[in-house]
Amino acid sequence: MADQQHLAVLKQGVAAWNAWRRQHPEILPDLSEADLSEADLSGANLRRANLMRANLSHAYLSEASLDEANLREADLTGANLREALLLRADLRQASFRQVNLIGAQLNGAQLSGADFRGADLSGGSLSRTGLHETDFSEANLSKVVITRKW
C-alpha cells in the first residue's frame, strides 16, 4: 500500500516531487498500488520508487526517470513513456499494452512475463534484459538495440 505522505507530495506536481526527492535522497518512495491513472508525471524522478501493482494506465511519463524502480505487476496500459529511463527496473508481469516507449531505455530491466502487445518501442534499447515469456505481439521494435540478455 502506498505511503500517503509520498502520494501527497506527488499530487503537488512534478516540480514539487522532484524538489522533495532532491531534499530526501535517502527515501525510497512507496507508491505501491497507487491509482495514478492519467497522471502527468512527465520528467518525474521516480528512480528506485516502489510502484508495484500501481495503476499508471494512460499516465504521462515521458522523459521520467524510473531507473531501478519496482513496477512489477503495474498497469501502464496506454501510457506515454517516450524517452523514459527504465534502467535495471523490475517490470516483471507488468502491462505495457499500447504504450508509447519510443526512445525509452530499458537496459538491464527484468521483463519476464510482461505484456508489450501493441507497444511502440522504436528507437529504444533493450540491452541485457530478461525477456522470458515477454509478449511483444504486434509491438513496433524497429531500430531497437537488443544485445545479449543476462
Language model features with spans:
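Tandem repeat scaffolds
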Residues: 7-8, 16, 21-150
